[in-house]
C-alpha cells in the first residue's frame, strides 16, 4: 500500500456512503480545493462512492486528469467544471455546473478570460495583504502549487502558516476579503450567466444551476429555463431545511435533472463537509448521460468542422 493510500485510509476510517451514490460537486488543488486529484479519487474509492464529478472552478484540467486516474482505481469520474458567472440584473454571483462537455475547447476562451481577471485581482489582494502582514509571495505560491490561480484560501493558508490565524475562514478572512468592507478585497469580473448557458450547450455540455440557496439564485433559475437549463443542484450542504423540497418540486414541474454534491473543498471550507455528504441518485446520473447523448447527436465535434 502506498503512503498516499495509507493516509487516505486513515482519513476515511470506517465511514461509508451508499455505493450507488454519486457526489457531483468536488474541487481539487487545480482550483480552490486543498486535496490533490489523486487524493479525491482515492477518498471516493475508500468511501464506497461509485461516481464523482470533478468540477474545479473555470477549468477542465482537474476533471480531465481525474478521469484518467479514476479509471485506474475503478471510480467513474464525470467530466465537469464550475463556471463563475454574474447575474448583473440583481448584482449577484451565479455558479453553473457544466457536465459531460463534448467539445470542451469551445469554453476555453471563457475560462482564459476569467483566469486572467482572477489573476489580476489576486495580485492586487496579495499586495494589500503583504502591506499589513509579513508574508511573502513564495509562502502563498507554495500553498497555491498546482492550482490554475491564487485564491483567497491560499493567502489565508500563508497567514495561518505565519501564525496570524488558526482557521481559513473566520474573523481575519472577513476583515480582509469581505466584498464591501474587506481591507484587501478586489473584485473579479465574471461573464453573464445568460451568456454561459447557451455556450455550454454549443459545446455539447449539460448546464446545471449550482447551489441556488448560496447565492439566492431562485429568480435567475426561472429566467434560465427558456435558455435550456438542464438541471438544478437540489442537495447541497448549505441548503436551508426547506430548499430540497422546493428545488425538487421545481425540477419535477419543468422536467429538470436533480443533482446533489458536497461542494467538496477539503480543508478550505467553512464547516466540515466530507466527500459524500450530499449525493445524486443513480437514476439522475443515468438521466444526465441520456440527455448528453442527445446533445452529442445534435452537436458537431470541433474536429469535424
Specify the residue positions occupied by each region the protein language model found.
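Conserved, well-ordered active-site substructure
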Residues: 273-283
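Extended substrate/RNA-proximal surfaces in nucleic-acid metabolism proteins
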Residues: 2, 6-13, 71-219, 282-303
